[in-house]
């Protein structure tokens, strides 16, 4: 379908030379009682908002004074921290966030409990006791006692001494000799043959001097009655006694040695 321009000079209907008619229709647009495009130019603000109608709205605050320059500066200063500082500050923030992520990846609790160790499995948050050693199994938090050594078995909680050791042993081990090989006291002072002989001689002299004093202190009547030499012993043979008299049962006779004094001293 083609459109052709229609040249008509009808002024009553207000149709100009810019009107068009269809080829299939014999009548024009003006003849069908339709408004021409020029009619819309008479009242453009009725159906469409023109640019001239929007201008008074923008200039409705034109009577107000302009704002002070100091207020604009304060507003701009306040808005500066909100804006990004630049590409140089981005790597620093990324590094801090990466370090926080790495530190948080190894921890699952508040006190630094390793990952995978839950409270339900028997793990505690105390750092002194190794993992897997619970209080119910007899393990304590004392660092000195080895694992598996309970108090009921006789082990103590001493941190410096292993179980079963002597208390004085570490003290003796601390005593160390000097680097020199010589003894602490010279041998000549400890063992002197001359000193020992003189000490023995003095003891013998004291004993010899004390013995006559004891003899002189004894009463004379006791010393005069006893003989100075012991009396001889007389041995009686077994032949003197007959077997029948000594052993009536017919058993073997035994020889007995009886000491007989030849002369008894007079006590008068």
From Swiss-Prot:
InterPro entries the record matches: DUF5568
Pfam family, one: DUF5568
Sequence segments annotated as region (Disordered): 1-20, 81-171
Top-level taxon in the UniProt lineage: Eukaryota
Skewed-composition ranges (Basic residues): 102-113
PANTHER family to which the protein is assigned, alphabetical: UPF0461 PROTEIN C5ORF24
Recorded family membership: Belongs to the UPF0461 family.
Record-given protein name: UPF0461 protein C5orf24 homolog
Organism: Danio rerio (Zebrafish)
Lineage: Eukaryota, Metazoa, Chordata, Craniata, Vertebrata
């Amino acid at each position: 379908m083609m459109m052709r321009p229609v040249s008509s000079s009808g002024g009553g209907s207000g149709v100009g030379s810019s009107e068009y008619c269809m080829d299939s229709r014999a009548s024009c647009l003006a003849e069908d009682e339709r408004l021409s495009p020029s009619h819309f130019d008479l009242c453009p603000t009725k159906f469409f908002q023109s640019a001239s109608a929007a201008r008074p709205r923008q200039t409705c605050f034109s009577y107000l004074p302009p704002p002070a320059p100091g207020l604009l500066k304060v507003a701009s200063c306040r808005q500066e921290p909100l804006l990004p500082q630049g590409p140089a500050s981005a790597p620093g923030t990324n590094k801090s966030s990466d370090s926080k992520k790495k530190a948080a990846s190894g921890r699952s609790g508040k006190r630094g409990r390793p990952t995978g160790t839950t409270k339900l499995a028997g793990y505690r948050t105390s750092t002194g006791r190794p993992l897997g050693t619970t209080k119910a199994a007899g393990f304590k938090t004392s660092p000195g006692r080895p694992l598996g050594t309970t108090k009921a078995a006789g082990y103590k909680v001493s941190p410096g001494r292993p179980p079963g050791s002597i208390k004085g042993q570490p003290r003796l081990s601390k005593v160390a000799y000097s680097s020199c090989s010589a003894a602490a006291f010279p041998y000549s002072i400890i063992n002197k043959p001359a000193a020992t002989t003189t000490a023995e001689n003095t003891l013998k002299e004291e004993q010899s001097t004390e013995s006559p004093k004891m003899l002189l202190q004894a009463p004379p009547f006791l010393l005069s009655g006893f003989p100075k030499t012991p009396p001889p012993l007389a041995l009686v043979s077994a032949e003197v006694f007959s077997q029948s008299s000594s052993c009536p049962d017919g058993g073997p006779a035994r020889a007995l040695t009886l000491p007989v004094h030849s002369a008894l001293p007079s006590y008068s």
